[in-house]
Amino acid sequence: DKDWYGTIPLGIIVTDKMIFTVCLEDTQVLTRFMEGRVRSFFTYMKTRFIFQILYRNASMYLRYLRIIDKKSEQVEEKLHLSTRNEELIELLELQKSLTYFITSLRSNEVVLEKLLKIDSIKKYPEDTDLLEDVITENKQAIEMANVYSGILNGTMDAFASIISNNMN
């Protein structure tokens, strides 16, 4: 089990005949597409394909945010029992992950809002609805990340004070 989660850029390049994705590592965002496990997935419907990738991306953020929340609760339980610096460091790593998530999600939000306003890209009838769903998922992920970050900051401050008091 990882104690932190990071983000990596994923580029999508669209030409007349192809769609390229560029990433420094293999990414789970694209795995389901490559395995043929995404319904209504057609590469010739370029805009929809891009929106499906973005939806999968937002969904994965939500999934990992829930994992981070559970992990922080587990670490907090351990802190209640031991009050060691080690658990505080684990919480710090989770907080760092949330900071990366928030930064990345906010960048995604700007791109998604621009995609909604651009008329020059071909959209199929359901594409606008799908893009709006992506925007909703992304906004939900931003809110969750902000809430979890606030809770984690408060928890770390409280336990740091407890540890400091115990040492005095």
Role assignments for model-derived ranges:
Residues D1-I89, E113:
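Extended alpha-helical interaction modules
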Residues K17, N57, E73-E76, H80-N168:
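Membrane-associated alpha-helical segments
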